[in-house]
Amino acid sequence: MPMVVAKRNARERTRVHTVNQAFLVLKQHLPSLRQFTKRVSKLRILNAAITYIDTLLKLIQSSEAVPQSVISATLGPIVPTPVRAVHKISKPDTVISQPIRPLAPVLPRHETYLPAPIAATCAPDHSLVDYRSTFASSLAPPVPMQMPSVFSPQPTFPYMKSLLDYPTYFYQPSTAPPPPPAPTAPQSHLIVNNQLVPMPSYQCF
């Protein structure tokens, strides 16, 4: 179903484009509308075409009595426009085409093209290439590439110690139970003024 809708929309766009091109060709052939560069309605183009055809018929009928200068002044210079208009007839194989006016191609914004002088300077200069050295280098035997070995001596750099390189005897937490308290010797006391006073102990060496 989406393919059918897409084809129908494409046919409709083609039809509208063909009609617009036909009206553009008709406008270019009308002296009264040729100077208008902006868009003109289709109804105005048709009315101007009818008036122009009537004027042509009258001039053709009275061309023997009217001088050529008056005809040129009335109709203006008839210049064929290089715009192509394709008219489809009853037979699908018969198509009448007129010369097409070259239209400027609409390029996307991301595409850029180099001008001719710059593009010409970018062409390679083959006159400076030494083909003899290239041919001799192509015949030379290939030189085996030496891969670096993991056992080859590596370059030495100044060694910096880390925390893992220092000894561990600076701080070693002890896991043994604390020692029992030392036994205290019995202390002697003196009675002074009916009070019990501890006697100082003396250590003998």
Swiss-Prot record:
Region (Helix-loop-helix motif): 17-56
Keywords: DNA-binding, Nucleus, Transcription, Transcription regulation
Subcellular location: Nucleus
Domain bHLH as annotated: residue spans: 3-56
Main location: nucleus
Keyword Zinc-finger assigned: no
A cellular-component GO term for this protein: RNA polymerase II transcription regulator complex
Top-level division of the source organism's lineage: Eukaryota
Region feature Basic motif, mapped onto this chain: 3-16
SMART domains attached to this UniProt entry: HLH
Gene3D superfamilies to which the protein is assigned, alphabetical: Helix-loop-helix DNA-binding domain
Protein name: Helix-loop-helix protein 4
Summary of the tissues where the protein is detected: Expressed in the ADL sensory neurons.
Annotated InterPro entries: bHLH_dom, E-box_TF_Regulators, HLH_DNA-bd_sf
Key word Nucleus present: yes
Function, as annotated: Acts as a transcriptional regulator. May mediate transcriptional activation by binding to the E-box motif 5'-CANNTG-3'. Required for the correct morphology, terminal identity and function of the ADL sensory neurons by controlling the expression of the ADL-specific gene repertoire, including chemoreceptor encoding genes, ion channel encoding genes, neuropeptides and the neurotransmitter eat-4. Regulates the expression of the srh-234 chemoreceptor encoding gene in the ADL neurons under feeding conditions.
A molecular function GO annotation: protein dimerization activity
Gene Ontology biological-process annotations: positive regulation of transcription by RNA polymerase II; regulation of transcription by RNA polymerase II; response to food
Disruption phenotype: RNAi-mediated knockdown in a rrf-3 RNAi hypersensitive mutant background leads to decreased expression of srh-234 in the cell body of ADL sensory neurons.
